[in-house]
A protein has these predicted regions:
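Catalytic cores and adjacent binding grooves of peptidoglycan-active enzymes
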Residues: 101-185
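Generic detector of well-ordered alpha-helical segments enriched in charged/polar residues
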Residues: 2, 70-74, 147
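N-terminal secretory targeting signals
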Residues: 1-13
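Short, solvent-exposed polar/charged micro-motifs at secondary-structure junctions
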Residues: 51, 55, 95-96, 168-171, ...
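A short catalytic or substrate-binding loop motif that flags glycine-/basic-rich loops and adjacent residues
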Residues: 33, 98-99
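Active-site acidic/histidine clusters and adjacent loop/turn architecture
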Residues: 12, 16-93
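Surface-exposed patches in mature extracellular/periplasmic domains of secreted proteins
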Residues: 80-96, 157-168
Length: 185
């Protein structure tokens, strides 16, 4: 249905978009609600006293991955790490890639930038500065429960791995980004 680089077969486009000739949603489709659904997921966050508490989010995703995304977030929520999430995004229609399919999630983008990895320190493409794996509890690392939970369901992380392998990308890393593609793209 979808290859490692994000090429979607005609059958896959029919399932994802309701049209074998379509390759993304623009957000203006009359039938968008037939394919993009709002789900609720629970996460942990940290209050001003430094205590963790449960948060419930509404997240827009493609109906084809809705149950899987719920299961991923339930896995993250139930993990002993109790990884905190204070910003979360799903479907958006500003590009033609996985977010516009409803098949990508961004987590804590302030701490987990989209970076140019050829500079030292890394230069944020979104934001103004970036440093790898900060001390922030919101920072996603290769060994975090978040990365493991998405990987368990075949989703990839845009942040690469502990050895700086970025799934075929050698100049950027998108630490906030998880996608239906195993490559994280």
């Amino acid at each position: 249905m979808i290859d490692a680089w994000g090429t979607v077969s005609a059958e896959g486009r029919q399932l994802l978009f309701g049209d074998s000739n379509k390759s993304y949603f623009t957000g203006s489709e009359a039938n968008l609600s037939d394919y993009i659904v709002t789900i609720q997921v629970r996460t942990w966050d940290i209050n001003s006293a430094g205590e963790k508490y449960t948060r419930t989010w509404n997240l827009e995703v493609n109906k084809m991955v809705a149950d899987e995304v719920k299961a991923i977030f339930e896995t993250i929520y139930n993990d002993p790490e109790q990884f905190p999430i204070h910003a979360l995004g799903g479907a958006r229609y500003t590009d033609t890639l996985r977010h516009s399919w409803g098949c990508a999630i961004d987590i804590n983008p302030v701490e987990n930038f989209y970076c140019n990895t050829t500079t030292t320190p890394y230069t944020a493409i979104t934001g103004t500065t970036c440093y790898k794996y900060s001390d922030s509890p919101y920072c996603i690392t290769p060994d975090s429960s978040v990365v493991r939970a998405f990987a368990q369901y075949g989703w990839g992380w845009g942040g690469g791995d502990a050895d700086n392998n970025y799934s075929g990308r050698n100049t950027t890393a998108d630490y906030m980004h998880f996608s239906i593609l195993e490559s994280g793209g």
